[in-house]
From Swiss-Prot:
Nuclease among keywords: no
Family affiliation: Belongs to the glutamate-gated ion channel (TC 1.A.10.1) family. GRIA2 subfamily.
Subcellular compartments: Cell membrane; Postsynaptic cell membrane; Postsynaptic density membrane
Gene Ontology cellular component annotations, sorted alphabetically: AMPA glutamate receptor complex; plasma membrane; postsynaptic density membrane
Record's bilayer topology term: Multi-pass membrane protein
Swiss-Prot/TrEMBL domain comment: The M4 transmembrane segment mediates tetramerization and is required for cell surface expression.
Name of the featured protein: Glutamate receptor 2
Organism: Macaca fascicularis (Crab-eating macaque)
GO biological process, one term: ionotropic glutamate receptor signaling pathway
Membrane topology (Extracellular): 25-543, 638-812
SUPFAM superfamilies linked to this entry: Periplasmic binding protein-like I, Periplasmic binding protein-like II, Voltage-gated potassium channels
Assigned keywords, A-Z: Cell membrane, Disulfide bond, Glycoprotein, Ion channel, Ion transport, Ligand-gated ion channel, Lipoprotein, Membrane, Palmitate, Phosphoprotein, Postsynaptic cell membrane, Receptor, Signal, Synapse, Transmembrane, Transmembrane helix, Transport, Ubl conjugation
Miscellaneous notes: The postsynaptic actions of L-glutamate are mediated by a variety of receptors that are named according to their selective agonists. This receptor binds AMPA (quisqualate) > L-glutamate > kainate.
Record topological domains on the Cytoplasmic side: 565-591, 611-616, 834-883
């Protein structure tokens, strides 16, 4: 583009000179353009073509230079003067303004400029730009500001600042004036951020930006970066091109932005020009082919019209103007002024035309008068004219009624962009989405909700998935919002229908509806393996302490029964035969020896019968209370036994956030960008603060980019990672196969999901009313049941729990079999021991008897001994043996 301009600059004078150089109708015009002023130069060329007449032609001589370089400006001005130009159009800044005005006054060469107006009287300087001081002061009074910051660019001069300070002294305003004109370009971003942070400390939230477009854009970028573009801030852009800047990026932040506009796009003259301007080729006319034009370019175009009209008036007055013989050295000493320069100056000041900048008229000092400046405010639907300012009427407000926030008229012909995020079950791609188009590709809770909202509000909508896959958080360093919140703040979407949590920091930059779903932060862990029943799981229905007490009670009852049986005379009785005859012995017997007492207590406890029972009242009392005791214990045991044997229990390693914070074996984290992370970062509760300290410093990072990644990490970590997320999502995933996650503990907080719209959006109130209506109709609960439970894959208990809880496995009762086998083995062992013991004892007795027989031989004695042996050791006989 620069090369094209340089070639045009070199060729234009030659071409114009070849065509008109020998013609008396050719009027030489100089041009001093700063580098980078492509659009201004294109507007100048368009004006030259547009306003050329058959009477005369304006022939330009263009120099492209650094206007801040006084030496370059001097050389260019003198070069133009030596070429015999009739007038010079150009730009200046604070460093070159004195040089140019001095040459103009000395040489009587008129200088037409769209640069900032100068103070005082400067002959031969025609200023196309209207003075902004009056309009700015009126706007400050309209907003009733009494304390604000004033950021100015010293390149534009200090006249406006001086007028503001004079009014401040008179009206007792508190003004903080800051010069941003000398800020180093290499460090400008950092310095702008530091500047606004200092203003924040001073509670300065009203700021006037008296700068040109490029510097305003740089400042606005940093204002957005540090989050000072939200509700509560008010900025006035003190130049004449309110729509020239990139307002889209600050449009939805919530801050009030006001300014001034000299080019009225509603004017028919401007509309016709824009029609032609937008058809120009960008390559031939750099900066053209757009539907807008910078105010400096518009003033440049108007300047060509003013010069053309001035020379036309001179022709009508038959005043002959010629530079023949008058082209000389501007540095001559003494300087030789151009004699006819005064006539041209007078003609220029007498011009009165309608241009792109409105009514163009000058006073005797070459300054604009009788002009009108539009007052603008930035709304969510773009810049809006709220009034105008003129020298006669001063501040006039024409916008008396602001559009209602509930007004959705005009949306019928607009497709509302709905931003959302792929998150099950809120928004999911259909299985056959590749065969579908538009909104039909998606399904889920929020998809159904968006359809209901659109039906109630009466608009068409288009679902779009957020590009970065994030919900929305502000970067701690750059202060830039990402995710769905960022798309709303920066105007990429009209509404967000997603599981977006309502938080304070988000509420500062966007608007939320009433919550359509309530929830809280919860803990997700991998479902622990169901514990296999132990060998002695049949003991689980009663605590081990109870079993110990039962054993002691059993022993105690047996001992008491033994004692009362010994002391009670009614337990002693003589032994009787089966036919009723009493024994010949006078000795009484007692059946409740210590072993029989133990046997009786055991039989009663096991609910089995026993051959013996107490005869005495005291013994029966002991037996009765023992039977009552065993009745209650056995009934309680039986009631709990079924549940303990048929239900496989899961033992969770953690049950609450406190459990997580007290250990380091299980890692835990949150979504990397969202309200859950922000909750822990801002929390002052000791447990949550401790958890945040751990999460922030954990290596490897415990934060995940998406919820799906967090769930996958839980499933793959073998119980060594816990994921903190919203309870609704936790409950949904718990109902999805492979059914291996679970929610533990209660919610850590209470919050809600809301539908978000840009600050001040006309959709806000309508969406809010729609949510309330859907809630009253019960549709929100119906949608949740549909996507959470009706489509669940794990059942109420998870997995195949119904089949598993109804059947007993061998492992459940293995201990009983072990006891049975152990008891049988013990019985056999005891029997063997008894046999061996008795055999050994009888062998010894037989040996003693044999020895005695050898000493006293007697057949009768032998017969008696044999009988005794037979009676005591008839192991294999059929007769009963009583030992």
């Amino acid at each position: 583009m620069q090369k094209i301009m340089h070639i045009s600059v070199l060729l234009s004078p030659i071409l114009w000179g070849l065509i008109f150089g020998v013609s008396s109708n050719s009027i030489q015009i100089g041009g001093l353009f700063p580098r980078g002023a492509d659009q201004e130069y294109s507007a100048f060329r368009v004006g030259m073509v547009q306003f050329s007449t058959s009477e005369f032609r304006l022939t330009p001589h263009i120099d492209n230079l650094e206007v801040a370089n006084s030496f370059a400006v001097t050389n260019a001005f003198c070069s133009q003067f030596s070429r015999g130009v009739y007038a010079i159009f150009g730009f200046y800044d604070k460093k070159s303004v004195n040089t140019i005005t001095s040459f103009c006054g000395t040489l009587h060469v008129s200088f037409i400029t769209p640069s900032f107006p100068t103070d005082g009287t400067h002959p031969f300087v025609i200023q196309m730009r209207p003075d902004l001081k009056g309009a700015l002061l009126s706007l400050i009074e309209y907003y009733q500001w009494d304390k604000f910051a004033y950021l100015y660019d010293s390149d534009r001069g200090l006249s406006t600042l001086q007028a503001v300070l004079d009014s401040a002294a008179e009206k007792k305003w508190q003004v903080t004036a800051i010069n941003v004109g000398n800020i180093n370009n290499d460090k400008k971003d950092e310095m702008y951020r530091s500047l606004f942070q200092d203003l924040e400390l001073k509670k300065e939230r009203r700021v006037i930006l008296d700068c040109e477009r490029d510097k305003v854009n740089d400042i606005v970028d940093q204002v957005i970066t540090i989050g000072k573009h939200v509700k509560g801030y008010h900025y006035i852009i003190a130049n004449l091109g309110f729509t020239d800047g990139d307002l889209l990026k600050i449009q939805f932040g919530g801050a009030n932005v006001s300014g001034f506009q000299i080019v009225d796009y509603d004017d028919s003259l401007v509309s016709k020009f824009i029609e032609r301007w937008s058809t120009l080729e960008e390559k031939e006319y750099p900066g053209a082919h757009t539907t807008t034009i910078k105010y400096t370019s518009a003033l440049t175009y108007d300047a060509v019209q003013v010069m053309t009209e001035a020379f036309r008036n001179l022709r009508k007055q038959r005043i002959e103007i010629s530079r023949r013989g008058n082209a000389g050295d501007c540095l001559a000493n003494p300087a030789v002024p151009w004699g006819q320069g005064v006539e041209i100056e007078r003609a220029l000041k007498q011009v009165q035309v309608e241009g792109l900048s409105g009514n163009i008229k000058f006073d005797q000092n070459g300054k604009r008068i009788n002009y009108t400046i539009n007052i603008m405010e930035l709304k969510t639907n773009g810049p809006r004219k709220i009034g105008y300012w003129s020298e006669v009427d001063k501040m006039v407000v024409t916008l008396t009624e602001l559009p209602s926030g509930n007004d959705t008229s005009g949306l019928e012909n607009k497709t509302v962009v709905v931003t959302t995020i792929l998150e099950s079950p809120y928004v999911m791609m259909k299985k056959n989405h590749e065969m579908l188009e538009g909104n039909e590709r998606y399904e889920g809770y929020c998809v159904d909700l968006a359809a209901e909202i659109a039906k109630h509000c009466g608009f068409k909508y288009k679902l779009t998935i957020v590009g970065d896959g994030k919900y929305g958080a502000r970067d701690a360093d750059t202060k830039i919002w990402n995710g769905m919140v960022g798309e709303l703040v920066y105007g990429k979407a009209d509404i967000a229908i997603a599981p977006l949590t309502i938080t304070l920091v988000r509420e500062e930059v966007i608007d939320f509806s009433k919550p359509f779903m309530s929830l809280g932060i919860s803990i997700m862990i991998k479902k622990p393996q169901k514990s296999k029943p132990g060998v002695f799981s049949f003991l689980d229905p009663l605590a081990y302490e109870i079993w110990m007490c039962i054993v002691f009670a059993y022993i105690g009852v047996s001992v008491v029964l033994f004692l009362v049986s010994r002391f009670s005379p009614y337990e002693w009785h003589t032994e009787e035969f089966e036919d009723g005859r009493e024994t010949q012995s006078s000795e009484s017997t007692n059946e409740f020896g210590i072993f029989n007492s133990l046997w009786f207590s055991l039989g009663a406890f096991m609910r089995q019968g026993c051959d013996i029972s107490p005869r005495s009242l005291s013994g029966r009392i002991v037996g009765g209370v023992w039977w009552f005791f065993t009745l209650i214990i056995i009934s309680s045991y039986t009631a709990n036994l079924a549940a303990f044997l048929t239900v496989e229990r899961m033992v969770s390693p953690i049950e609450s956030a406190e459990d997580l914070s007290k250990q380091t074996e299980i890692a835990y984290g949150t979504l990397d960008s969202g309200s859950t992370k922000e909750f822990f970062r801002r929390s002052k509760i000791a447990v949550f603060d401790k958890m945040w300290t751990y999460m922030r410093s954990a290596e490897p990072s415990v934060f995940v980019r998406t919820t799906a990644e967090g769930v996958a990490r839980v499933r793959k970590s073998k119980g060594k990672y816990a994921y903190l997320l919203e309870s609704t999502m936790n409950e949904y995933i718990e109902q999805r196969k492979p059914c291996d996650t679970m929610k533990v503990g209660g919610n850590l907080d209470s919050k809600g999901y809301g539908i978000a719209t840009p600050k001040g959006s006309s959709l806000g109130n309508a969406v809010n009313l729609a949510v309330l209506k859907l809630n009253e109709q019960g549709l929100l609960d119906k949608l949740k049941n549909k996507w959470w439970y009706d489509k669940g894959e794990c059942g109420s208990g998870g997995g195949d729990s119904k089949e598993k809880t109804s059947a007993l496995s061998l492992s459940n009762v293995a201990g009983v079999f072990y006891i049975l086998v152990g008891g049988l083995g013990l019985a056999m062992l005891v029997a063997l021991i008894e046999f061996c013991y008795k055999s050994r004892a009888e062998a010894k007795r037989m040996k003693v008897a044999k020895n005695a027989q050898n000493i006293n031989p007697s057949s009768s004695q032998n017969s008696q001994n044999f009988a005794t042996y037979k009676e005591g050791y008839n192991v294999y006989g059929i007769e009963s043996v009583k030992i």
